[in-house]
């Protein structure tokens, strides 16, 4: 997994994932290049916008992205987690989860289930080739 956090909500979510499920996660920088498939976790800014660093990172690594998850705040109404919808549409990758602020235990379970489904699907594809 890769992630970007601004206020700390995404970072707290990722840290909880690491503690609960021992997953590997990399906080992206402007220069991050990924050599393996990944799921990216980010946040929504402004009125449903994608953070610029996330957009640039995924553009550079778009052939390896397998899904996105996004933090948001429901007080934004229709703009809640909208960055996830935008990333999903732009890069033709599934939106795996929208979670509020730093998420819940149920959100942690949900993202792990989604990752397992992706891994299972990729294993079947590898075996078919």
UniProtKB/Swiss-Prot annotation:
Domain of life from the UniProt record: Bacteria
Pfam families xrefs: Flavodoxin_NdrI
GO biological processes: protein modification process
Gene3D superfamilies (UniProt xref): 3.40.50.360
InterPro entries reported in the protein's UniProt record: Flavoprotein-like_sf (IPR029039), RNR_Ib_NrdI_bac (IPR020852), RNR_NrdI (IPR004465)
Family, per entry: Belongs to the NrdI family.
Cited PANTHER family: PROTEIN NRDI
Function: Probably involved in ribonucleotide reductase function.
Protein name, as recorded: SPbeta prophage-derived protein NrdI
């Amino acid at each position: 997994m890769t992630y970007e956090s601004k206020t700390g909500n995404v970072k707290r979510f990722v840290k909880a994932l690491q503690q609960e499920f021992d997953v590997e996660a990399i906080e992206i920088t402007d220069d991050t290049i990924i050599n393996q498939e990944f799921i990216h976790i980010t946040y929504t800014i402004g009125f449903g916008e994608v953070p610029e660093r996330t957009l640039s990172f995924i553009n550079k690594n778009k052939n390896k992205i397998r899904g996105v998850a996004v933090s948001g705040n429901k007080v934004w109404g229709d703009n809640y987690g909208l960055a996830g919808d935008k990333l999903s549409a732009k890069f033709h990758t599934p939106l795996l989860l929208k979670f509020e602020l730093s998420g819940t235990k149920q959100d942690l379970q949900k993202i792990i289930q989604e990752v397992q489904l992706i891994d299972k699907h990729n294993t079947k594809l590898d075996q078919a080739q």
